[in-house]
């Protein structure tokens, strides 16, 4: 039986390397590559054609869901597993829409990730317990349950990304630098987020991000 070929995508070198060591110690896995952001992950996936891509959600540069969608469009058989500390409904919905096969909380042990990789490589799906109760399956496809859809609001992936930073005490200029965007663009994103959520100041915006777990992504 051939080993399952894995590509790891995470902007934290320690996380990437630790996962690579732990997974490589299991005879059924072969970590064929690592990437530090979604854009590099996309290029590596096309070049290496892994069986499974394990991708962090919170990374600078290209939005992970955009990269994953492009990977799926080019490599239909590749399975995507997302890792994140944030279990915000919008993230879950975005992952399901692009056809992710798994979504795990980063706090879970490596063995849970190993189980997820085995399951998705065999054609199944794997979701953390906290997520299973918020999704429904119909004819082999998964989506957010209606109650969760109501909570996910209408925020875009970029707006969700912007929303994480005010609670960390960062200025718009600092956020712009991290996201490689102009301060004016960040200001526009913040204004749209506040309008959609009916929030009227940055303090309230930060509280919302903390309550939704977005600062832990």
Predicted regions and their residues:
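Conserved acidic segment of CheY-like receiver
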Residues: 2-15, 19-23, 53, 155
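Short hydrophobic/Thr-rich beta-strand motif most characteristic of the beta2 strand and flanking loop
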Residues: 28-36, 44, 199
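Acidic catalytic/metal-coordinating carboxylates
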Residues: 37-40, 60-66
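Short amphipathic alpha-helix used as the core "switch/output" element in two-component signaling
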Residues: 43, 65-77
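Active-site beta3 strand of CheY-like receiver
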Residues: 48-54
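Active-site residues of response regulator receiver
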Residues: 56, 84
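Short, flexible helix-to-coil linker/hinge segments that flank and couple to helix-turn-helix
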Residues: 90-157, 161, 203, 214-215
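Recognition helix of helix-turn-helix DNA-binding domains
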Residues: 169-204
